[in-house]
Amino acid sequence: MKHVFIVNKISGKHKAYNIIGLIKDVSEAKHLDYEIKVTEYKNHAKEIAESYFYDDDVTLYSVGGDGTLLEIVNGMNLQTPLGVIPAGSGNDFFRFFDGNAKRDLRKIINDTIDAIPKDIDIGVCGDMRFVNTTSIGLDAIINANASRLIRNTFITKGPAYLISIIENSIALRTTHVRLFADDKEIEGDYYIIACMNGKYYGNGVMAAPSASLSDGYFDLCLFKKANRLKTYSLLLKYLKGKHEGVDGIDIIRCKHVIIDTDKMVDCQSDGENYCSEHIDISICEKALKLKIPF
């Protein structure tokens, strides 16, 4: 068995690149047949993952954040076991297993290598796989606007997201949608529509407190339009994961979601931005063999 660590060298302010020595120490202490691949450009992690096949007898490891994991999941053969070493800025997927995602990295690496793979669900949106979430609304707009600021100005990631959060929290734009959640049809104006496989997204927002990665269902969060005072109150609950059963935010368990809008809107899947007016999302039950260190 070969262990291949795919490292995003810029992830987490170079945190992933800086733990290469730690990966080597643990791997050599275990006498592993291992290889470290460092990404050089966007989608390089996907290309690296695509180069391995199930009969290669290999385990892949995502060393970075949610974006690195997204690339690998979209490139890999799903019969290949995958481990996640949280070395990004958000690590929202890993928070499902460790709420603060701040455990000792040496122990995480060691325990992930030793872990027996477990089958978990993933989502598919169009031709993109995702492990955590696909959403439209304020969260996707904030993500897209921050990314544009980073790309087109000298503003760095932290301030860019802060500016985008402030601007869009004041504007409070809604999106009019017609959606189907399995056989249920819904139409209305919403601030956020988040189709959750995991619990967390957006750097620690617990949108789906009761989500499971192996129940064969999404938790579809629908944040309805309301007056400004109520919206801010609900938003605080939403950010802290205290919104289950609260009037104004519905959570529907479903396997298939279709969302139609009357114009192109910002969307995101595990932090990857795009625009669409038609989104078709399906659950793929127990599709990914994940090595979980706990």
Predicted regions and their residues:
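Catalytic core of DAGKc-family lipid kinases
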Residues: K30, T39, L78-P81, A87-Y191
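Gly/Ser/Thr-rich active-site loops/lids in small-molecule metabolic enzymes
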Residues: I150-A160, P209-L229
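ATP/NTP phosphate-donor binding region
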Residues: M1-L60, K184
